[in-house]
Amino acid sequence: LKPRFRIAVIGAGRAGRLHAVNASQSISSAELSCIVEADPEVGNKVGDELGVPAFTDLEQALAGAAFDGVVIATPTFTHAQLAVLAAGAGKHVFCEKPMALTLDECDEMSLAADEAGVVFEVGFVRRFQPEFVEAKSRIEAGEIGRPMLVKSLTRGPGLPPPWAHELHRSNGMLAEVNSHDFDCVRWLTGSEIERVFAETANFKGAERGVTAPDYYDNAVVTLRFVSGALGTIDGTCPADYGYDARVEVLGTEGLLVVGQNQATSLLKIRARGAGEVPTYVSWSQRFEAGYRGELASFVKTALAGAVPEVGAADGRAAVAAVRASNRSWLEGRPVLVASESVA
């Protein structure tokens, strides 16, 4: 029997627990080695549930457990330090999006992985969700011609965690919610984003007790791609009707719509799962297959010593687009993504 790839999951919140369950139960070539969680009560609960030890920091785990790779599912402002430490210890790294807060951090993480000779993969789940994969394949096959216009949206039903309310600790909702969109439109169009113009609004923050400056719960970004294509990204969090993720690509010869679940031309949706058509109640339900697929891809890539499907350059590109969009709405002007080359 081939040895299984041993994984330490860092962060036992919603995403971390999902990755831990998948590593433990859904990927035959992998096994869960341990949980790393700063809150010992949370870490021990997940560890006990899955039958593995829990540690309160990565240094303890490196000293006390054997593993081949890590999954980083902690707040964004901790990603760089953890990734550099793990890579320096010779561990392969799967990092949840957003990759980091700044491009300098992205570069540090990428360099650490390169110098250590380990795989570094970023968790852009849509690249592994079957309907998105099929859309990419059809676009590459030329079924709709050359992409001209792309529209992508993500709406989440709950408030982000408190640390994500603060722009300087998270880069805001455009990072926490819409990083997926920035990556997805690059991937589907096959082109880098050249210029962005963003507008934001705050409709629900005050009534839900959010006091952080520069907080917003709605955003729209218009895009121009290097290829000449145009696009829009929008995000809302919280969107009380449920979790929603869709993309539309208009080409010179046709249209692809991914994630549409509407049976009527006029539709009203209010409560999660109780409207005129069913809605997804959470991101984990919407992308269940994708989360299994991305972790399986990481394991396969690490075992083979291959190039990851979604690497550090992809994570960096999304961070650059997010930061340019934040500069755009803060300064009220279009911003070239290349101007964020160092920040």
Q: What role is predicted for each listed range?
A:
Residues E108-V125, G145-S152:
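Rossmann-fold dehydrogenase core element
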Residues A38, D240, W283-A296, V310:
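Active-site loop of classical SDR/Rossmann-like NAD(P)-dependent oxidoreductases
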Residues R126-P213, G332:
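Predominantly a Rossmann-like dinucleotide-binding segment in NAD(P)-dependent oxidoreductases
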Residues F182-A263, R292-G305, V342-A343:
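Contiguous beta-strand/loop segments that form the cofactor/metal-binding neighborhood of enzyme cores
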Residues L1, G69-I72, V226, K300-A343:
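C-terminal helix-rich "cap/oligomerization" subdomain common to oxidoreductases
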Residues T56, I72, F94-C95, F120-V122, ...:
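Hydrophobic residues in well-ordered beta-strands that form the structural core
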Residues L1-L50:
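N-terminal Rossmann-like dinucleotide-binding module
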Residues H19, L50-A112:
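Beta-loop-alpha module in the N-terminal Rossmann-like domain of NAD(P)-dependent dehydrogenases
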